[in-house]
UniProtKB/Swiss-Prot annotation:
This is Glucosamine 6-phosphate N-acetyltransferase. It comes from Trypanosoma brucei brucei. It catalyses: D-glucosamine 6-phosphate + acetyl-CoA = N-acetyl-D-glucosamine 6-phosphate + CoA + H(+). Homodimer. InterPro entries: Acyl_CoA_acyltransferase (IPR016181), GNAT_dom (IPR000182), GNPNAT1-like (IPR039143). Belongs to the acetyltransferase family. GNA1 subfamily. GO terms for biological process: poly-N-acetyllactosamine biosynthetic process; UDP-N-acetylglucosamine biosynthetic process. Potential novel drug target for African sleeping sickness as this protein is essential for the infectious bloodstream form of T.brucei. Therapeutic application depends on development of parasite-specific inhibitors, because this enzyme is also generally essential for eukaryotes. D-glucosamine 6-phosphate binds at residues 28, 86-88, 117-118, 122. The gene is GNA1. The keyword Transferase applies.
Amino acid sequence: MTDIVDLELRVLEESDLSSHLELLGHLTEAPPLSGVELANIADMRRRAGIVTKVFCHQPTGRIVGSASLMIQPKFTRGGRAVGHIEDVVVDPSYRGAGLGKALIMDLCEISRSKGCYKVILDSSEKSLPFYEKLGFRAHERQMRLDL
């Protein structure tokens, strides 16, 4: 585990995009994208209201942890919203230092402040204990159709 003293938790900035994409490669397939492609995707996400919080290593500018939040207004539940947390990832050298927990708690607090009645996320089997420690519980099942 690496020292976390030089880390800042903040919103993803345009200057972070390449480093963020590199970090996402620890989570899933994340092929290289051009600067223009990254900027276009970031703009679409911003317009959709998606918030991505990151841990930035201040001396190097490297992104070492991130998670995203999408707020979905509902017609049910009196119009209250649901927070969807996605793409939670921490660089392997920083795992166990509490970054994942801090990211999740920060996004849960944003969800609460936006009036969400619940926060949901998808998880691999191996990550279930981590989320359960944070108060999440397994509920229903996810379905998927690859296009």
